[in-house]
Amino acid sequence: MDLPVDEWKSYLLQKWASLPTSVQVTISTAETLRDIFLHSSSLLQPEDELFLKRLSKGYLVGKDSDAPLFYREEGNKKFQEKDYTGAAVLYSKGVSHSRPNTEDMSLCHANRSAALFHLGQYETCLKDINRAQTHGYPERLQPKIMLRKAECLVALGRLQEASQTISDLERNFTATPALADVLPQTLQRNLHRLKMKMQEKDSLTESFPAALAKTLEDAALREENEQLSNASSSIGLCVDPLKGRCLVATKDILPGELLVQEDAFVSVLNPGELPPPHHGLDSKWDTRVTNGDLYCHRCLKHTLATVPCDGCSYAKYCSQECLQQAWELYHRTECPLGGLLLTLGVFCHIALRLTLLVGFEDVRKIITKLCDKISNKDICLPESNNQVKTLNYGLGESEKNGNIVETPIPGCDINGKYENNYNAVFNLLPHTENHSPEHKFLCALCVSALCRQLEAASLQAIPTERIVNSSQLKAAVTPELCPDVTIWGVAMLRHMLQLQCNAQAMTTIQHTGPKGSIVTDSRQVRLATGIFPVISLLNHSCSPNTSVSFISTVATIRASQRIRKGQEILHCYGPHKSRMGVAERQQKLRSQYFFDCACPACQTEAHRMAAGPRWEAFCCNSCGAPMQGDDVLRCGSRSCAESAVSRDHLVSRLQDLQQQVRVAQKLLRDGELERAVQRLSGCQRDAESFLWAEHAVVGEIADGLARACAALGDWQKSATHLQRSLYVVEVRHGPSSVEMGHELFKLAQIFFNGFAVPEALSTIQKAEEVLSLHCGPWDDEIQELQKMKSCLLDLPPTPVGPAL
């Protein structure tokens, strides 16, 4: 996903392996990115480009005139099953393949409006109705869509507009008698019912307003940092001789305090975990749902009513405004390259979009200016010697009175301020000397192939009369003879190498569960990849003192615990002490980020010499004490006479148990609740015989039982099971962790639906306290908790005890 697809990656690595040793040495010992790029790109042959082109065609990103009917029919099947979300997504796929001002476009929009109406998304439904009519919705079908429009307006409390719509509908009947003949009796009855409903209603509460702007305003940084853009005044930028740039607390910081709120300088939506579709006749069009179908490709807002690009079927947006902005900033160039960019991977895509956002001319200027002042090696490897020194871009000479003019910290401007701009992005470390030669070769050839496609597209856009002679044509199409292409290629190669250590995974919480389930499960999914210059300054800890959350393309860093003045602000790069053991964390950090972690969590665990983390521990079958040892495990209780058992035997039992849990979870997803409970109860009994009480699988089983019992309406049993899961989560992740917040949210849902008012209010308060440390007030779960609390507080007092 980040790197190219496996076929292209394997192809390039084989090409590297087949190169003469002298060529490999030349690339391996090249001192600058420019040399790496030029040496590598000279090896890209026409047959390589043809192979890449064939791979790119595996992604069906163009518009297919036969696809709208297919997706409309598939959407209709989902609609009949009352899966309105699934139907809306399939109708959106039909929209993305439709041409403007066609019946296909209008019918897909109209059908999607019906799905949105059943989902209660009335404002969005109205927009789709207007789109359907704009694109030429057939006259014979107008009554149905106009009635739906009136129903939306009534639901939104816009009664005057609803009345006008009904009047227009009735007037059309009078003016066009043929319409009355095709108007079904059910539609006439619905029209009568709607008119009666309007008479009964004086007004309706307005739909939930766009409170997002207000919550963002409420959560804004109270006091801007003069040295760091988008950062609180509670933190400062420093340089450590060993760590390089870092952020430290300039005053005592309380848990939950907002430290950084930064919009991504550039971001690209991850296409999803699914492979490209096969080319069989039965799978020409893909009905699978990915992030690209659910989120705006520019602002990352979740939407079921996507607005597609007019030129391709891949890029989709939440509004016409986002579509227009994306087109003007970068998509006009990316649009014809969609399949190629998906083949080359997200990192290559970001590298291109970054240069497009900045502008090729500005990229050329900054690199040329650097070339004029310092050596190529310093440009390409700014981390090579002195991490503190950097060029002062605002001065016209590199030396003054024999002294090097420098700003104190790389990435800062002439006034010493570090901002969210291209200067800061350019100064993020590419770690060129740490990447393997074959990886640099792979990245360079990806960028080179992309540059050649950009050249070809640019040449097609140049009128032939503008090309005076053959030398101009040669300069336009040959990268080696075109200095601009070399500059662009070097810039994109630098950014591609930077991304391994500086890319930020932009995540969201997705709720899953059986259809119609009141209590849902949640999981964190990677939605996009972005560059955040300020957040990139944070160093790693396996037990960080901050938490990150996202809304749209904005990342928010909050203190997850009390931070003393002078203490470093630390972020987790992924390997967290509650998710993996110290050996695995060290290996991942070393391979991706090129450092050996020496955080307190790693040092503490390294000295313990434990067999493994508690969430992977086994217990004694006789006394329940934890088992100890490596290959052979023995009971940790001295008074227990239980014989030793091999770890392999217990691991095998665990694997069998996990398979049974997966079967039960599928039963739960399919709605076979009683069978799921029976299967999970058996799994629970088996787990208790050999797994430690804090084992992750014990919590997983309890969570599944809680969801099954909730779906059956047995709220008391559901709460009991979830509290057991809650214990496992608390021991593993901590009482103030975001994972604990999600579990408390689920428990609050169960108490709320079981009418256990005191328990619900108490749990809601705990959940809000924990989640507020990690998320802003706009968080979906926090808003839902507030609605539940408001509802419970409005209930009349009752002497009856809790329902649970």
UniProtKB/Swiss-Prot annotation:
Keyword field: Cytoplasm, Metal-binding, Methyltransferase, Nucleus, S-adenosyl-L-methionine, Transferase, Zinc, Zinc-finger
Enzyme class label: transferase
GO molecular function: histone deacetylase binding; methyltransferase activity; zinc ion binding
Keyword field contains Metal-binding: yes
Residues that bind Zn(2+) 2: 309, 312, 331, 335
Stretches annotated zinc finger (MYND-type): 296-335
Sites where the protein binds Zn(2+) 1: 296, 299, 318, 322
Family: Belongs to the class V-like SAM-binding methyltransferase superfamily.
Protein name: Protein-lysine N-methyltransferase SMYD4
Gene field: SMYD4
